[in-house]
Structures are given as C-alpha cells and as structure tokens.
Amino acid sequence: GWLHHKGLNKHHWEYWWDKINGKWQAIKMPQKYVVESICDRIAACKVYQKDQYTPASPLNYYLSSKDEQNLHPLTANLFERILRYIQINGEENTFKRIKELLHQKKDLYQSF
C-alpha cells in the first residue's frame, strides 16, 4: 500500500525521482507539492508525537531523514527554509505568508 501511495501522490519526494539519460535524478518539485508535503509532514508529526509535538517537530523530523531523501537541491533548500520558518514563527504565520506569496503569483523558490 505504501509504495502505491507514495508513487501516486505528488507530495512525496519519491514521485519526483526519475531516470534521465540512464541516470536516476531528483527533479525539482513544483511549489504546490512542496506545500502539500509540508502539510503532510506536520500532520504526521502531530499524529505520531501527540502531546510531544512542537513547532520544531517537522524540522527535526526532516533533518533526521534528509540524507535518506533524494530531493532536488532547490527543493531541499525550500523545504528547510519553510520548516525553519515554522519553528520560529509557527504554522499560522507560515501559511499566511505562503498564501500571500502565492496570491501575488510569487515563486516560493525565489521569494520564501
């Protein structure tokens, strides 16, 4: 079930891994799916950590497994910037900022 889930859901990094010219490479994840992935990460941390959850939990989870994830370097950088912003400013302020940038048609890779 897990292989099916991550292979069909574009917010999983595994979806953005492809063989190009005979070599496996990470592909830059569209910002829409970066945001979905951040939400998925937050939800998973809240479910598994329950009362132990803090605004740092999604970042800590990401950092603990980032070497095992084959994210495109630009995607990895954006993930970490957003997760650090959550740690410092909280979810509400982070998603408010993301919504503002998206409504202004800004590229999160450039503007966040």
Label for each model-derived stretch:
Residues 1-112:
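Metal-dependent phosphohydrolase cores
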